[in-house]
Design a protein with these regions (language model features):
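Structure-specific nucleic-acid interaction/processing domains
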Residues: 1-15, 21-104
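C-terminal single-pass membrane-anchor helix
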Residues: 102-134
Length: 134
């Protein structure tokens, strides 16, 4: 038994693809204790998904396939552009292994407009309290 897994960030980008012949728990634990990827990668993970394969060779081939398909930011270039002349007839479904963060919901406005509105409202509330409430 072996696995191909991927890290997905809060913006739904696939940022890393890997494979393992270990249990998912052991491999993911290694990533988060002595991982080889930048800390920025691990901090941006929203969830981890995987596909189970019958053999280690299947998982390795599919790792290269998915790296070439998705071009994840944190995969090394030596795996990319390894041209595979295979056809994947029936792609398996990815299963969620672990959710690290809730999906990113953005409330930010461009150029800090929301920040200016909040500061303006605070300033007006202080002004009203100090000068108009008398």
């Amino acid at each position: 038994m072996a696995y191909t897994y991927r890290f997905i960030d809060t913006n739904e980008n696939i940022i890393y693809v890997g494979y393992t012949a270990q249990t998912m728990a052991k491999r993911i634990g290694q990533h988060f204790t002595k991982g080889h990827l930048p800390k920025k990668c691990y901090k941006s993970i929203q969830r981890i998904e995987y596909i189970k394969w019958e053999t280690k060779s299947d998982a390795q081939v599919m790792e290269v396939f998915y790296i070439n398909k998705y071009h994840p930011r944190y995969n090394r270039l030596d795996h990319q552009n390894d041209h595979l002349n295979i056809q994947v007839a029936d792609e398996k479904e990815w299963e969620v292994y672990q959710v690290i963060k809730k999906p990113n919901i953005k409330y930010e406005a461009e150029n800090g407009v929301l920040t200016w509105i909040m500061w303006g409202a605070l300033a007006y509330a202080i002004f009203e309290f100090l000068f108009l409430s008398r």
